UniProtKB/Swiss-Prot annotation:
Source organism superkingdom: Archaea
Protein name: Replication factor C large subunit
Subunit field text: Heteromultimer composed of small subunits (RfcS) and large subunits (RfcL).
The family this protein is said to belong to: Belongs to the activator 1 small subunits family. RfcL subfamily.
Annotated keywords: ATP-binding, DNA replication, Nucleotide-binding
Residues that, per the record, bind ATP: G46, P47, P48, G49, S50, G51, K52, T53
Signal peptide residue numbers: none
Record flagged with keyword ATP-binding: yes
The UniProt record lists the keyword ATP-binding: yes
InterPro entries listed in its UniProt record: AAA+_ATPase, ATPase_AAA_core, P-loop_NTPase, Rep_factor-C_lsu, RFC_lid
Segments of this protein annotated with the region Disordered: 445-492
Function text: Part of the RFC clamp loader complex which loads the PCNA sliding clamp onto DNA.
């Protein structure tokens, strides 16, 4: 699969997004050269992905020039520049056309393999008969101080954020995709003026067939990705030890991450089985040293891991592979991005299990297999465990499926309703008992009237019918009183 950056690279300056002033300056420069007015070479500078190399090739195509290019993956010492650039700068091409020489990333000249490169470039430029365009990311590096006086500096600058969405939209439509405008804006703003990076992001995200807004939000850090793409390209293309090892010097990535990138892209670059086998062999040896670094905390082994990973991989190929290769982020990163929500949910479940079982998250994982079986086979026990671990409906659904989750929470809801009804009934009974007790405290107790039998009733009636007996009793009372009085008188 061809890399979209190369597939849709503009063939004409008119197709280059933005850079209106830069394009005008380049056209004026090369037209003056064609008219016979010799011009200084142009040093086109700007951040990575701003289109410097693209504009150099586009202007050559517009004005029918052949191109000879030396980039960061090539050896660019004094002898090479003298032989390749020096010859091309003063002669016509085999086709009879004029030649445009492109020296890409001259600010990357470093190491033993590039020794004397800058001084030789200055020497060649003085005698050049053909136009020369140099590109650089950081034109103010001390190593380029002498070169700046020999060239005309043209600022490419970064691509304006508003110029990126139309390009992405056009590429997506040509590839048969319709993308939400919000996603395109997210990718564009994330690129930070780096059109190449934006196109790489678009292609990486569309590898899965579609893009969601969350995928665009979870794009990796732009600076790191920009550096890693450049580093991988250098490692894969070069056959020189120093160039390969220097590719990761300023890289803001761990070696483990670089290893994943190389592993992902090695089969795309190395088409010969022997080269591929050697490359993976060196990569595995690098991984062994990385493991020793982490286990023993001996970081002196780090340089061996780095050398095996970069130079080992680069020198595994018999010959340099020409042409463009589509490099992409490791699929493991894409999968991790897409499973982020699921992993967070699983982590929350394991936390709840760990709290109840007094184990770590790692230890709680061992209970998951049992939970899966229980939730699938025993609904009542699954309900009890859900209540015990305080799982939410979404968490139970994550462990099982929607149907089981629905059944479990239906049971829980029924039990809650039953408990509520029982509680209300008990409350009602308690209120009634309390009311009776309070009523008894307020009202006095009325003694019950004794029951009267039929015989007692007849006796009462008989007494009422014989008044003589009452008279006799009444007449007897004074006698007893007088006797008592007489008795008392004796004491006085």
């Amino acid at each position: 699969m061809e890399e979209w950056v190369e597939k849709y690279r503009p063939k004409s300056l008119n197709d280059v997004a933005g850079h209106s002033k830069t394009k005008e300056a380049l056209c004026y420069w090369i037209e003056s050269f064609i008219r016979g007015n010799k011009q200084k070479p142009v040093l086109l500078f700007g951040p990575p992905g701003s289109g410097k190399t693209t504009m150099a090739h586009a202007i050559a195509n517009d004005y029918n020039f052949d191109v000879i290019e030396l980039n960061a993956s090539d050896k660019r010492n004094k002898d090479v520049i003298s032989q390749v650039v020096g010859t091309a700068a003063t002669s016509k091409s085999l086709t009879g056309k004029r030649t445009l020489i492109v020296l890409d990333e001259v600010d990357g000249l470093s190491g033993n393999d590039d020794r004397g490169g800058v001084s030789e470039i200055i020497k060649v430029l003085k005698n050049a008969e053909n136009p020369v365009i140099l590109t650089a990311n950081d034109v103010y590096k001390p190593a380029l101080s002498s070169l700046r006086n020999s060239v005309t500096m043209v600022d490419a600058g970064s691509v304006h954020t508003n110029s990126i969405p139309p390009v992405l939209r056009k590429i997506a439509l040509k590839e048969g995709f319709e993308i939400d405008e919000k996603v395109i804006k997210l990718i564009s703003s994330h690129a930070g003026g780096d059109l190449r990076a934006a196109i790489n992001d678009l292609q990486a995200l569309l590898t899965g067939g579609s893009i969601e807004i969350e995928d665009a939000k979870n794009l990796p850090d732009r600076d790191s990705e920009k550096s890693i793409f450049d580093a991988i390209r250098i490692i894969m293309k070069t056959t020189h030890y120093d160039i390969a090892t220097s590719a990761t010097v300023d890289l803001k990535e761990e070696l483990g991450t670089v290893s994943e990138w190389i592993s992902e892209n090695l089969p795309k670059e190395y088409l010969k089985y022997g080269d591929l086998a050697k490359g993976y062999d060196y990569l595995s040896k690098s991984d062994v040293f990385l493991g020793r670094v982490y286990r023993r905390q001996y970081f002196g082994l780090w340089r061996y891991a780095s050398a095996l990973m970069t130079a080992g991989t680069a020198l595994s190929k018999e010959d340099k592979y020409r042409g463009f290769t589509r490099y992409s982020p490791p699929t493991v990163f894409t999968k991790l991005s897409r499973t982020k929500v699921a992993r967070e949910k699983l982590k929350e479940i394991l936390k709840k299990i760990g709290i109840k079982t007094h184990t770590s998250i790692k230890g709680a994982r061992s209970t998951l297999d049992f939970l899966y079986v229980i939730f699938e086979s025993n609904l009542q026990m699954a309900t009890d465990l859900t209540l015990y671990y305080e799982f939410t409906k979404e968490e139970v659904e994550f462990l099982t499926n929607k149907k089981i989750s629905k059944d479990i929470f239906s049971i829980i809801e029924c039990e809650k309703t039953k408990k509520t009804d029982d509680k209300n009934l008990m409350k009602k009974d308690l209120e009634e008992d309390t009311f009776k007790e309070k009523t008894n405290e307020i009202m006095p107790v009325i003694p019950k009237r004794p029951k009267i039998s039929d015989n007692q009733i007849s006796e009462i009636l008989t007494k009422d019918n014989n008044p003589k007996d009452d008279v006799k009793k009444a007449s007897k009372k004074p006698e007893s009183t007088s006797k008592k009085q007489a008795t008392l008188d004796k004491f006085f």
